[in-house]
Structure formats: structure tokens, C-alpha cells
Amino acid sequence: MSEECTHDCSNCGAACSSRDAAPQHDAPNPNSSVKKVIGVVSGKGGVGKSMTSALLACAMARRGYHCGILDADITGPSIPKLFGIHGRAMADDKGCWPIQSRMGIDVMSINLLVENEEDPVVWRGPVIAGAVKQFWTDVVWKDVDFLFVDMPPGTGDVPLTVFQSLPVDGIVVVASPQELVSMIVAKAVNMAEMMKEIGRAHV
């Protein structure tokens, strides 16, 4: 796969692994251009997954890459708070636009769409999964080199939706050194490998 790959095979004649799997993924917003999608996962909560997502984006931004973070943790979003973002995301006829942090990192989170960031999101799994999918299909990710997807812990509806809907190029697994955590992390890694085998991810 070319380093310039945007996962849009409609205007590309190159033969690569991305072309074989691309039809199974949801198309991004027509105005988006995302080169690499990196999932950040963990077996359990409280291990610093969201902080890792933020630090990875900051590190790559300092290297000159344009980065974005898709906050897929719908019921426990923390990315806007980490970047000190309190505004509301805006939308127009092209789609919904992420809010840019002071470092130039594009951020989209459910907390940027609700009136009060402390209001709970009491949605069932399919609705949450649908919202995450819309963060990919409806949000304009403009000229993003690396899009980090901060997922909720575990192997539930949201991680499954991300692997099925987005062209994930790789994952970062965040863990703490406990035996129980290691076992749960193994589940997350095995899930990623399973999705790779059936052509849903490039990890």
C-alpha cells in the first residue's frame, strides 16, 4: 500500500492489499482525506488509553504531520477535556467539522455535540455504534495524515464497528502490568487479528 493511500480505491489503479479489503468498509465523507487510521484500544478502563491517544497525536503533530482524533468512547469521552476544547462542532452542507486544538489537531467527540458536557449518554449499543460510524462518514477529516481512534475498553460494539467500518491500518494496545489485564488485552489483540483475517482491517 502506498504511503499516499487515502483508502479510496475508486480513482486508483494500484494493486495493493487495501484494494482487496476496501469495499467492505464504509466510505468516508466525500470531503475527507485520511491517509492512516490507527486504533487505540485497551482491555480495561483506567490504563491511560485516552492520554496515550492524545500524546500520540501530539508527538506526530510535532513531527509535522496533520493529525486527528476520533473519540469513539461515546459514554466516557475525555479527549476534548485533555485538549482544553469546550466549543461546539459546527456543520454545513459538506458535513460536520471537527474542532481544532491549539496544536492543530482535529478532534471530534460526542462532547462537542451535546449542550452540556456533563450530560450522560444513555444510548444502547446499536445507537452508540451508529454514532461512531457517523464520526467517520459524516465528519470532514481534511488532509489528515494520521487519524487516531480512541476506543472504549474491551471488545464490545464500538471496537467491532470501528474494525468493520473504518480502514484500520494498525492498533496501539494500552495495558497495565497485571495478570488480569493481560488476559483481557489478549482478547483485544485476538479480536484485531480475527478482523484482519476476514479482511476487515489491515493491522
Across the structure, where does each feature detected by a protein language model lie?
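Signal for well-folded cores of large energy- and translation-related assemblies
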Residues: 17, 39-42, 61, 80-87, ...
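Walker A/P-loop phosphate-binding motif and the immediately C-terminal alpha-helix
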Residues: 31, 36-74, 189
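Residue-level signature of catalytic and energy-coupling elements of molecular machines
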Residues: 34, 45, 71, 79, ...
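Conserved catalytic-core segment of NTP-binding enzymes
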Residues: 145-202
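A short, basic/flexible loop-to-alpha-helix module at the beginning of a structural domain
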Residues: 25-32, 136-138
